Structure formats: structure tokens, C-alpha cells
């Protein structure tokens, strides 16, 4: 998770600086990290509930969805739900770190700014609310449709979209595998 966070932060900084090539490299690397994490579930799924119970206490609150690193990744990429901060209230240092992330634009916020600039659009301000979950927005959807309908004209934006979709796919599968494994054990 630490490497994923490092790479996602770097991707965001490169995207802010409009260095798309570097951004693509970082996002691709994070997608590969989650691909490897997904592959690990093939081994972890062989564990029985008693196998898992033998070491679960050693993980403390640092495992899975309670992990502050997991939550940082969620917030950094753009899945921002402030209700999830409550899990970390017992650790003021981690809570402060998570709140600080919510004050930064997410990777998706920055991607929307790039889309807005490149397409010469004016996306609605509510698309850029830092600490709130994204809402469906016709203007944003229309911008992505325009990019996907004309990929050769907007190749770099199309490539950005594809990198984000790839990352989301691996991350979503990791979350799904995590939940299924926990149900099993």
C-alpha cells in the first residue's frame, strides 16, 4: 500500500504539472501493484477460518478497510466519504493525515481540471468539492463522451481516461476479493 500511495501522489503531482506521460507511467504502476495484490488473494483464499484466526490479532486495526493506508488511497483517487474518518478517531495522528488528504484535490479532481482545460470547458464548481463524494454530473459525463467519441483528436485525454479505468478496475477487484475472503473466514 505504501508504494501505491507514493506512486499515486507522484501521479497527482505530474498531472497537476500537466506531465501526462509521467502520470500514465505512475498510474500504470499502481494498477500493476493492485494486480499483484489481487493475485495474492489466490493464496489467501486457501486459508480456513482457523488458519486466519491464528494470526488475525497481530494485524490489529491495520488490515483491509480499517487501514489508514487503504483509506488514503480511496481519498487520493477520489472516493471521498467523510463518514469513513470515524474509524480512525482513536488515532489523532492518522485522522489528521486523512483530513489533510481531503483538503487536497484528488487524482480525479485534477484529471477533471485537465479535461476542462484541454476541452476548453467550464465544468460546474460542485464537481470540485474536495471532501465530498462525486455526484453524477451531465457536464462531466458529456466531456468524457466527447473524448471517447473522438479518441484520435483527444488522444492524451483518452489515454488518461483509460489509465484511470484500468486502475479503478484492479482496485475494485481487490476490494471485492477482500470482502469475499472475509466472508469466507
Ranges and model annotations:
Residues 183-185:
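Conserved small/polar residues in nucleotide/adenosyl-binding loops
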Residues 15, 19-29, 54-65, 132, ...:
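Non-transmembrane, amphipathic alpha-helical segments
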Residues 90-178:
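Internal, well-folded beta-alpha domain core
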Residues 26-92:
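Extended amphipathic alpha-helical segments with heptad-repeat/coiled-coil character used for oligomerization
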Residues 3-37:
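Short secondary-structure subsegments characteristic of cysteine-rich extracellular domains
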Amino acid at each position: 500500500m505504501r508504494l501505491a500511495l507514493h506512486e499515486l501522489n507522484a501521479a497527482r503531482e505530474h498531472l497537476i504539472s500537466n506531465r501526462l506521460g509521467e502520470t500514465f507511467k505512475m498510474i500504470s504502476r499502481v494498477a500493476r501493484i493492485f494486480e499483484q495484490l489481487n493475485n495474492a488473494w489466490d493464496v489467501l483464499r486457501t486459508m480456513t477460518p482457523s488458519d486466519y484466526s491464528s494470526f488475525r490479532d497481530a494485524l490489529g486495526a491495520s488490515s483491509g478497510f480499517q487501514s489508514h493506508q487503504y483509506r488514503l488511497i480511496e481519498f487520493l483517487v477520489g472516493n471521498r466519504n467523510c463518514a469513513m474518518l470515524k474509524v480512525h478517531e482513536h488515532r489523532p495522528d492518522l485522522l489528521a493525515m486523512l483530513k489533510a488528504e481531503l483538503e487536497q484535490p484528488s487524482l480525479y479532481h485534477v484529471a477533471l481540471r485537465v479535461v476542462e482545460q484541454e476541452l476548453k470547458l467550464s465544468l460546474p464548481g460542485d464537481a470540485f468539492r474536495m471532501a465530498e463524494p462525486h455526484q453524477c454530473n451531465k457536464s462531466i459525463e458529456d466531456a468524457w463522451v466527447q473524448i471517447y467519441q473522438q479518441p484520435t483528436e483527444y488522444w492524451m485525454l483518452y489515454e488518461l481516461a483509460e489509465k484511470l479505468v484500468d486502475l479503478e478496475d484492479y482496485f475494485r477487484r481487490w476490494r471485492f476479493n477482500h470482502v469475499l475472503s472475509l466472508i469466507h473466514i
